[in-house]
Amino acid sequence: MSSSNVEVFIPMSQENTNGFPTTTSNDRKAFTEGAVLSFHNICYRVKVKSGFLPGRKPVEKEILSNINGIMKPGLNAILGPTGGGKSSLLDVLAARKDPSGLSGDVLINGALRPTNFKCNSGYVVQDDVVMGTLTVRENLQFSAALRLPTTMTNHEKNERINRVIQELGLDKVADSKVGTQFIRGVSGGERKRTSIGMELITDPSILFLDEPTTGLDSSTANAVLLLLKRMSKQGRTIIFSIHQPRYSIFKLFDSLTLLASGRLMFHGPAQEALGYFESAGYHCEAYNNPADFFLDIINGDSTAVALNREEDFKATEIIEPSKRDKPLVEKLAEIYVDSSFYKETKAELHQLSGGEKKKITVFKEISYTTSFCHQLRWVSKRSFKNLLGNPQASIAQIIVTVILGLVIGAIYFGLNNDSTGIQNRAGVLFFLTTNQCFSSVSAVELFVVEKKLFIHEYISGYYRVSSYFFGKLLSDLLPMRMLPSIIFTCIVYFMLGLKPTADAFFIMMFTLMMVAYSASSMALAIAAGQSVVSVATLLMTICFVFMMIFSGLLVNLTTIASWLSWLQYFSIPRYGFTALQHNEFLGQNFCPGLNATVNNTCNYATCTGEEYLAKQGIDLSPWGLWKNHVALACMIVIFLTIAYLKLLFLKKYS
């Protein structure tokens, strides 16, 4: 194979079936309508850290280099080895890549993409991000409610949903749950079609898919591509990345783009790719899968490729493939640049752009078709359905709360009004406070588990960050922290025989709720934006352990050195424990058999609740009680603000 710059001319009408039967259907139908997406001189560079040592400057890495091409209505496949840049190119075309380090133009029918392109086009991610606790129809209803304009009636939206269900062949499973790790649901192919249906609700003219066959068996993968082929015949421009498709899938492609190391190896009609590489010096054995053959060429796998051995193909290139890979990719890229395919593509690109330099648009704006309140209602509705549809966690939490309440009630049953009563009251109130904190650690999952779902739906214009944030709080966080506090108070309060007044009972319940909400808010502030639950859980546990030390039971806060005492003001258990002590001890008498004279002489004995509170440094006034709730409320606001800002500024583009 020569590296000279001699033009490799391959007639555009040439077709090579490689021994396979030709298709008689009009798979290569020319579309007169539909969107034509063209990309001009796309370059993408990222800065990566060169090491863990501080002070090292990041190194710039080229991901895509001068990529040009045209995607017309039909099936447009982007093929390449792992790390070749196919997913990066797909994200660039779909306006879902971080614009920093990106240059070049992407045009739709010769014009710049609209600012709401991400919302008008469809994008199916590699990992299916659908709510598994909902049915197929309910998932599509959620997409329709938030992505279709409010001017459409519910009847029109339902007609659109039914049409999508029928088009995707989901009629039999429309009312079946998609499925989770705990709930058996639809098959993998039906789940993938549901993900596609979520995007088809808006009837996009361009549909992007990131490796739609990943995780599917060969038969299911073939069925998914046949579905996409039928959709492309309706005039849709379908662009997708794929890795090693079998021949029955490959023959469905209308256009093929081959990438390696961010360079363009081939771009043109898929059925003419074999003839192109054969004229370039590569021959595919009969009945070999063309897609595998192309990857073998790019990877330099000479054991599977029959090469025209020229004088410059030396034995060292076979022995040391790592030294040969980069030059081989460069040679293939140069051969393509010298081919007639590249020349005709450039001429068509020039015609589409009108020869004018377009202004690059940064696509970070997201438009919404619905109001904040409408989005809030639907996010809350879906979250509540998800809670009811996956009752294992919620029911388990309630059962554990009931059992733990009964155990604590049995241990501290019938508190006495003596010196032991003081110790036992302080102990059980401390336990109630710390238990509320540690049971709130589960709140870290609220945003971590749905991170991919949130990012995809936010970029696609389903809802605002604020709608999602408050919707999750109202439907998930509030009820799941309120109910255990109510149950715990009702069980424990009367079994322990605490102060028998209604106001004391409800103050205790309110205090436990505030502790649970503040601890959960702290969990959200730590976990928001995280990808791993275990990391957030570990950080939460460490924080609560330090907070316990400054809660007021393990050490008397009045005895702590001044240079450390300020840490008590950051302790959630301290505020809860102080409020519970103020509520329970105020007005109590623990020495009913002693008169005032004896009580005055026995300064070492604590006979009243006021004395105990004074020794703990607790203010006896009503403000001494309510200031703890004010502090907890302030912490809730601060932590929720941090969580919201972390979601708002979360890196949503790859």
Swiss-Prot record:
Residues 388-650 form the ABC transmembrane type-2 domain. The chain crosses the membrane at residues 395-415, 428-448, 477-497, 506-526, 535-555, 630-650. InterPro entries: AAA+_ATPase, ABC2_TM, ABC_transporter-like_ATP-bd, ABCG_dom, ABCG_transporters, P-loop_NTPase. Its main location: membrane. It is a multi-pass membrane protein. Broad substrate specificity ATP-dependent transporter of the ATP-binding cassette (ABC) family that actively extrudes a wide variety of physiological compounds, dietary toxins and xenobiotics from cells. Involved in porphyrin homeostasis, mediating the export of protoporphyrin IX (PPIX) from both mitochondria to cytosol and cytosol to extracellular space, it also functions in the cellular export of heme. Also mediates the efflux of sphingosine-1-P from cells. Acts as a urate exporter functioning in both renal and extrarenal urate excretion. The keyword Transmembrane helix applies. Homodimer; disulfide-linked. The minimal functional unit is a homodimer, but the major oligomeric form in plasma membrane is a homotetramer with possibility of higher order oligomerization up to homododecamers. Keywords: ATP-binding, Cell membrane, Disulfide bond, Glycoprotein, Lipid transport, Membrane, Mitochondrion, Nucleotide-binding, Phosphoprotein, Translocase, Transmembrane, Transmembrane helix, Transport. Residues 37-286 form the ABC transporter domain. It catalyses: ATP + H2O + xenobioticSide 1 = ADP + phosphate + xenobioticSide 2; urate(in) + ATP + H2O = urate(out) + ADP + phosphate + H(+); indoxyl sulfate(in) + ATP + H2O = indoxyl sulfate(out) + ADP + phosphate + H(+); sphing-4-enine 1-phosphate(in) + ATP + H2O = sphing-4-enine 1-phosphate(out) + ADP + phosphate + H(+). The lineage of its organism: Eukaryota, Metazoa, Chordata, Craniata, Vertebrata. Disulfide bonds join C591-C607. Belongs to the ABC transporter superfamily. ABCG family. Eye pigment precursor importer (TC 3.A.1.204) subfamily. This is Broad substrate specificity ATP-binding cassette transporter ABCG2. N-glycosylated. Glycosylation-deficient ABCG2 is normally expressed and functional.
